[in-house]
Amino acid sequence: MMDAESARKNIEDLKARIEYHNRRYYQLDDPEISDAEYDSLLQELIALEKQFPQWLTEDSPSRRIGAAPLSKFAPAVHLSPMLSLANAFSEEEILEFDRRLKRFLDSSERLSFVVEPKIDGVAVNLIYSSGVLTTGATRGDGAKGEDVTQNIRTLHTIPLKIQNGSDERLPEQIEIRGEIYMETAAFRKLNERRLAAGEPPFANPRNAAAGSLRQLDASITARRPLKMFCYAVGIVRGRAFTYHHDVLHALKKWGFSVNPFIRQVEGIEKCIEFYRELQDLRNELPYEIDGMVIKVDDLSLQTRLGAVSRSPRWAVACKFAATQATTVIRDIIVNVGRTGTLTPVALMTPVKVGGVTVSRATLHNQDEIDKKDIRIGDTVLVQRAGDVIPEVVKVIVSNRSGREIPFKIPDTCPECGSEVVRLAGEAAHRCIGLSCPAQLRRHIQHFVSRGGMDIEGLGDKLVSQLVNQKLIHDPADLYYLSHDALLNLERMAEKSVSNLLSAIELSKHPSLDKIIFALGIRHVGEHISKILARRFRTLDALINTTENELLAIRDIGPEVSSSILEFFRNASNRRVIEKLKKAGVSPLETISPRSAPLTGKTFVFTGALSRMTRDEAKQIVESLGGQAAGTVTKKTDYVVAGEAAGSKLQKAQKAGIAILSEEEFLRLAGKI
């Protein structure tokens, strides 16, 4: 039997190894071990800590799993105030900020600044004592916030213990400030899952981050895709810094995530250049930003400048123009989804929002309509952020004429006339018709989509014809369509029929993640499909999986696991899969990540590609173990430049990143 001292050494070794692999996975996007190996290390640690509880410490990775739910959040006092920033709304106001600094300092010398994107998230304050995380709190009123330490511990991008790879002494105590946020893609997927479960969606990524962080049950926070960028420190005891950029360098060295777009610049003119650059880059970033922050770099000057009211003189938040506009709701229609969910959609007078013309906006569900009191004929404020679907923020009640018409989701399905029900505990109304053509149409559209089987030429109108003519009753029927049956459909000539049948034949050997996505399993989007494909490698292995196997995979919780198991237990679904197999549909076995030729490499595509679409290029990269990103960063290995390549190419050239032509990329990927 292991003695206590041996257990202590094993526990310390396991903690160090797990935190190392956490950083490789969550911060560097470069894992060295499989999920199964990681889970084995974690379970070994948990077992040892249970056997030897005297060695269970606050910085243990086992603490990330989540403690017992709280009844309420306790207050947490910050060691130093978390001040709010004054705002600048134009380039002239940015110049005035610089003039104010020089007047106060009685100096005309050019100042050095640090500029950074202003993340639209939730500000938090972390306190580390002797290198160990002891408290995590929301900003609150600036003097005290809510103690959310249990939830903070579940975020893998936040070290439980400061990493120190040198002999340099760590601060005795330090406050680390940062912004907790949710990436736009993760936000969309979270809302998709919530809508599918009949839960109200979050209005925007910031609200989703705030709601996820302020969960009394930390296990819920642990399942939400939260991340954090650190941008400053408060009280520091036992360590001195000279410049703000030194602080950021130390934070990175200690294992914290710092935004890669932060820059040190000389003079206010360079700040304005960065402000313009960020506005151009804004919609390409994987997270939402609502401006830029400028800070005086010299910490001694920050001290001299001090604060006025509740804002520091040495920093300013430079806001972007709002991505909102007003318009009028002309009508409200109801769409029926593939799971039978009825979604109300506002048809609006077209209006430009964030540079894009918007004429439709989702209203989510009846609760959302009632809460905002949205009526046909209302003047409303609509919002569009990044590529998120436009939404109605609020009604301009003062514009009402009295002729506006309240809206209620119908009691019968607008597609098939079946009864519409709302199950207890759900926000969604659902059609319960077993043969609802709208549900089948949506299911087939999902199956043949680019993210699924990617069958070219099978558009929405043709799918509707196939369903209405009762030529298909499930996705597998597509592979049994005859030449003559297709030729009898509207606008289908000999050539178009031949092309469609060829496209259907070509789709028979997709990558495994594509067929998993195409099946339409509830809560399983493209991201989870890729995770499942990497883990199980064949469809049969996934079909025969167990709950324990699924729950051992990071990013898959009880809800997703239950949905997967229920799908494959369903006799009707199993029959469809058997029909697909008999038709010759056979997904390619997923390559082990370790043997894939592009493993660990990150690609960015820019310009127009002539031999493939961007999505096809991305699929090639991911199928060979690499990653496709939207922006050029220090982590980028290759930029693939097509015709009329833009700023991404210039940035890559300046950074010395390898540039590939489309042909060179295809050769590297083994496609030519």
Swiss-Prot record:
Which residues are annotated as active site? K118
Which GO cellular component term is one of those annotated? cytosol
Class in the EC hierarchy, top level: ligase
Q: Which domain of life is it from?
A: Bacteria
What region holds the BRCT domain? Answer: 593-672
User: Is this entry keyworded Thylakoid?
Assistant: no
- Keywords from the UniProt entry: DNA damage, DNA repair, DNA replication, Ligase, Magnesium, Manganese, Metal-binding, NAD, Zinc
Q: Which reaction does it catalyse?
A: NAD(+) + (deoxyribonucleotide)n-3'-hydroxyl + 5'-phospho-(deoxyribonucleotide)m = (deoxyribonucleotide)n+m + AMP + beta-nicotinamide D-nucleotide
State any GO BP term from the record: DNA repair
Q: Which residues bind NAD(+)?
A: D35, A36, E37, Y38, D39, S84, L85, E116, R139, E179, K295, K319
Q: Output one GO MF annotation.
A: DNA ligase (NAD+) activity
Tell me its cofactors: Mg(2+); Mn(2+)
Report residues binding Zn(2+): C413, C416, C431, C436
Which CDD domains is this protein grouped with? BRCT_DNA_ligase_like, LIGANc
Which InterPro entries does the record associate with it? BRCT_dom (IPR001357), BRCT_dom_sf (IPR036420), DisA/LigA_HHH (IPR041663), DNA_ligase (IPR001679), DNA_ligase_AS (IPR018239), DNA_ligase_CS (IPR033136), DNAligase_adenylation (IPR013839), DNAligase_N (IPR013840)
Q: What is its EC number?
A: 6.5.1.2
Q: Which HAMAP family match?
A: DNA_ligase_A
Supply the NCBIfam families for this chain.
dnlj (TIGR00575), PRK07956.1 (NF005932)
Please report which protein family the annotation says this sequence is part of. Belongs to the NAD-dependent DNA ligase family. LigA subfamily.
Q: Report the function annotation for this chain.
A: DNA ligase that catalyzes the formation of phosphodiester linkages between 5'-phosphoryl and 3'-hydroxyl groups in double-stranded DNA using NAD as a coenzyme and as the energy source for the reaction. It is essential for DNA replication and repair of damaged DNA.
Q: What is this protein called?
A: DNA ligase
